[in-house]
């Protein structure tokens, strides 16, 4: 298995400098990761640097809390795509999901899907560590209904990250035709393999190089 092609090589720390981001971009070129996942401010740079390389430009929307308005998320999506993003990872409105406001949650996702239609993949971060199993299932069902391409476990900025159990539950819920992304706490090749075995079709990690080289010593998970 070519694990590199399943990895979104991630740098989302708020204090990331241009030098930090360029390092991630160069590593993505070298190891041929599926994408670089960066904050929106770096999308234009990444798109320019990765032109001609088989590496997608992924960014985050409504990140990390998911509590911005639907209109803001849709605008962020259009703006990111205009600057060169080919994948967007949006955060659901977790509070609305917990309130049982399915209509709001679905519309929130749907508007981002529409803003990205035909131009970028949409991954929906459900923030599993804050949800009950019933809420995880509902979040996945609403994501599929809204037309998302992927569901994703975590931002990496909350109380926990991906678990194999959550990946299995999400895969069971969305079926074979929607992607499942494991992110948060995936630091080693063993971690990544466990997620893929449980049903993940993509892995988000900042320790991507260590995962590919199978080097536990080099692994950190500082998004």
UniProtKB/Swiss-Prot annotation:
InterPro entries assigned to the protein according to its UniProt record, in alphabetical order: Aldolase_TIM, DeoC, DeoC/FbaB/LacD_aldolase, DeoC_typeI
Keyword Lipoprotein: no
Main location (coarse class): cytoplasm
Key words, A-Z: Cytoplasm, Lyase, Schiff base
Xref: SUPFAM superfamilies: Aldolase
Any single GO CC term annotated in Swiss-Prot or TrEMBL for this entry: cytoplasm
Catalytic activity of the protein: 2-deoxy-D-ribose 5-phosphate = D-glyceraldehyde 3-phosphate + acetaldehyde
Any one GO molecular-function label of the UniProt entry: deoxyribose-phosphate aldolase activity
Protein origin, superkingdom: Bacteria
Presence of the UniProt keyword Cytoplasm in the record: yes
EC number(s) stated in the UniProt entry for this protein: 4.1.2.4
Gene Ontology annotations of biological process type: 2-deoxyribose 1-phosphate catabolic process; carbohydrate catabolic process; deoxyribonucleotide catabolic process
Family to which this protein belongs: Belongs to the DeoC/FbaB aldolase family. DeoC type 1 subfamily.
PANTHER family on file: DEOXYRIBOSE-PHOSPHATE ALDOLASE
Reported function: Catalyzes a reversible aldol reaction between acetaldehyde and D-glyceraldehyde 3-phosphate to generate 2-deoxy-D-ribose 5-phosphate.
Entry protein name: Deoxyribose-phosphate aldolase
Organism: Bacillus mycoides (strain KBAB4)
């Amino acid at each position: 298995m070519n694990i590199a092609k399943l990895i979104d090589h991630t740098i989302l720390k708020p204090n990331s400098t241009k030098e930090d981001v360029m390092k991630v971009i160069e590593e993505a070129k070298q190891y041929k990761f599926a994408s670089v996942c960066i904050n929106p401010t770096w999308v234009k740079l990444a798109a320019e640097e990765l032109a001609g390389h088989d590496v997608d430009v992924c960014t985050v929307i409504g990140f990390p809390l998911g509590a911005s308005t639907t209109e803001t998320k849709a605008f962020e999506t259009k703006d990111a795509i205009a600057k060169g993003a080919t994948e967007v990872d949006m955060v659901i409105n977790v509070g609305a999901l917990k309130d049982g406001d399915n209509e709001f949650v679905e519309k929130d996702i749907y508007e981002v899907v529409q803003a990205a239609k035909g131009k970028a993949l949409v991954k929906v971060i459900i923030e599993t560590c804050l949800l009950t199993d019933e809420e995880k299932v509902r979040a996945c069902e609403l994501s599929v209904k809204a037309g998302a391409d992927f569901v994703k476990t975590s931002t990496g900025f909350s109380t926990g990250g991906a678990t194999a159990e959550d990946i299995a539950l999400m895969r069971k819920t969305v079926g074979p035709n929607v992607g499942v992304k494991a992110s948060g706490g995936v630091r080693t090749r063993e971690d990544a393999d466990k997620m893929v075995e449980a049903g993940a079709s993509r892995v988000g990690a900042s320790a991507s190089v260590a995962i590919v080289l199978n080097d536990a010593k080099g692994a950190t998970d500082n998004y």
